[in-house]
Amino acid sequence: MALKLYNSLTRQEETFEPLEPNIIKMYVCGVTVYDYCHLGHARSYIAWDTMRRYLIWQGYQVRYVQNFTDIDDKILKRARETGSSMDSVAKRFTEAYFEDMKRLNVLEADEYPRATQNIDRIQNLIHDLEKKGFAYSSGGDVYYQVREFSQYGKLSGRRLEEMQAGASGRVDSEDLETAKKKDPFDFALWKAAKTGEPAWDSPWGKGRPGWHIECSAMVQDCLGETIDIHAGGADLIFPHHENEIAQSEASTGKILARYWLHNGFVTINGEKMSKSLGNFTTIRDLLDQPVDPMALRMFVLTAQYRKPIDFTEEAIASAKNGWNTIKEGILFPYQYGPKLGWEMPAKNLSDQTLLLTSYLEKFQKAMDDDINTPAALAILFELAKDLRREGNVLIHEGKTETSLEELKKQWVTLVSLSQVLGLEVKIEEQVSNISEGLSNIEIESLIQQRLEAKKAKNYSEADRIRNELQSQGIKLIDKSGGLTNWHRN
């Protein structure tokens, strides 16, 4: 089965075919660095990181570029509010972005172009659009002339005539004169300098670039005139991505991207996330509660990337449980290896012969279906639960039902596929994760103490021990004859 992706441009799923064999050029719109990243950012960058990981796993060389918008009205507003400079605000929140993404196990991009580092390229692109009749200057500003681009609206499906009808009565000649535009739908490529704001010299006077032109210039500089994948949140379809297409394609005469991909929104308890509603949650606030970063990543992956996802306490609790199941499977040889004679399991990961083909095929089928991560997770759960069952059998019967060689195959397959989804237990955490919980010997000792308490009719003590074990994620199953089985939840 070939990889199929939903292309926002054509509004249908298409078989993915790269421009060049085995090479993929991918551009993702990055953050405007004026505040800490929120759950919407987590959803977006985990989604594209997962897609990138899968493409690499499939053997592609992925050239992944993601920009930073480091000059913008929001950054300037934040600088004024905090009495600092635009550069210091941008630097602070760029560093915060990297900290958050590292915790979420999002791979770094191959390149992070910044708007302020590409002023010359931006000006050259604006000048080219002006020469070709797609842009005009007006009082120090430069605007894109939307009606000159006949395909405007092809991504968003919006028609100028419909937008104009919707705007009727809201734009009059005085507004147009004030805005210095020929048409209310024209948008700024270059903004004339304002007192106290950063500005650069240009053929149109001192000023700074508009938002949309930045990405067009950086895509061309880093990846060329036509790329394979352009991705971002669904909120960027209009006007940002629509305007990018208008700028780039008017300049080059070539399509900007073959595939336009957009991730769905995050809601909080069914409501749109916003500061005004008081339900705005940053990544770091959530992780500092603490929520395991991999549980947050798991939460994002439980929905296919194009679908909306609702953040609730129940959803994050379910994601925590899901991650604990997979983590337990990943830690299986570190916990049970000594009893099985399984030494240095990490060495097995490089042995491709240990990968179970049937699971690989099911995983690939799921991911080829427009990166269907919920279906892919189901395959990981199947492997992890099999390993959990074998661990419980080993504890109670002293041996596993499955051979060591087969257990190795299940484990290597689980770890390999988990890595494709970015779900990993760091090496330095492997021992500590086991030691954080009760050891098997400690559990058996407490069960024996509970049995003795019950024999002495000290039921309050027996209940206390049961509750203590339950708080540690240990479920007890009392059998006839005074036997108690247990397993980790």
Curated annotation (Swiss-Prot):
<dbReference type="GO" id="GO:0005829">
    <property type="term" value="C:cytosol"/>
</dbReference>
<dbReference type="InterPro" id="IPR009080">
    <property type="entry name" value="tRNAsynth_Ia_anticodon-bd"/>
</dbReference>
<keyword id="KW-0547">Nucleotide-binding</keyword>
<comment type="subunit">
    <text>Monomer.</text>
</comment>
<feature type="short sequence motif" description="'HIGH' region">
    <location>
        <begin position="31"/>
        <end position="41"/>
    </location>
</feature>
<feature type="binding site">
    <location>
        <position position="244"/>
    </location>
    <ligand>
        <name>Zn(2+)</name>
    </ligand>
</feature>
<dbReference type="GO" id="GO:0004817">
    <property type="term" value="F:cysteine-tRNA ligase activity"/>
</dbReference>
<keyword id="KW-0067">ATP-binding</keyword>
<dbReference type="InterPro" id="IPR014729">
    <property type="entry name" value="Rossmann-like_a/b/a_fold"/>
</dbReference>
<dbReference type="InterPro" id="IPR015803">
    <property type="entry name" value="Cys-tRNA-ligase"/>
</dbReference>
<keyword id="KW-0963">Cytoplasm</keyword>
<feature type="short sequence motif" description="'KMSKS' region">
    <location>
        <begin position="272"/>
        <end position="276"/>
    </location>
</feature>
<dbReference type="Pfam" id="PF01406">
    <property type="entry name" value="tRNA-synt_1e"/>
</dbReference>
<dbReference type="Pfam" id="PF09190">
    <property type="entry name" value="DALR_2"/>
</dbReference>
<feature type="binding site">
    <location>
        <position position="215"/>
    </location>
    <ligand>
        <name>Zn(2+)</name>
    </ligand>
</feature>
<feature type="binding site">
    <location>
        <position position="29"/>
    </location>
    <ligand>
        <name>Zn(2+)</name>
    </ligand>
</feature>
<keyword id="KW-0030">Aminoacyl-tRNA synthetase</keyword>
<keyword id="KW-0479">Metal-binding</keyword>
<dbReference type="InterPro" id="IPR024909">
    <property type="entry name" value="Cys-tRNA/MSH_ligase"/>
</dbReference>
<dbReference type="GO" id="GO:0008270">
    <property type="term" value="F:zinc ion binding"/>
</dbReference>
<dbReference type="InterPro" id="IPR032678">
    <property type="entry name" value="tRNA-synt_1_cat_dom"/>
</dbReference>
<comment type="similarity">
    <text>Belongs to the class-I aminoacyl-tRNA synthetase family.</text>
</comment>
<dbReference type="GO" id="GO:0006423">
    <property type="term" value="P:cysteinyl-tRNA aminoacylation"/>
</dbReference>
<feature type="binding site">
    <location>
        <position position="240"/>
    </location>
    <ligand>
        <name>Zn(2+)</name>
    </ligand>
</feature>
<keyword id="KW-0648">Protein biosynthesis</keyword>
<dbReference type="GO" id="GO:0005524">
    <property type="term" value="F:ATP binding"/>
</dbReference>
<keyword id="KW-0436">Ligase</keyword>
<protein>
    <recommendedName>
        <fullName>Cysteine--tRNA ligase</fullName>
        <ecNumber>6.1.1.16</ecNumber>
    </recommendedName>
</protein>
<dbReference type="InterPro" id="IPR015273">
    <property type="entry name" value="Cys-tRNA-synt_Ia_DALR"/>
</dbReference>
<feature type="binding site">
    <location>
        <position position="275"/>
    </location>
    <ligand>
        <name>ATP</name>
    </ligand>
</feature>
<keyword id="KW-0862">Zinc</keyword>
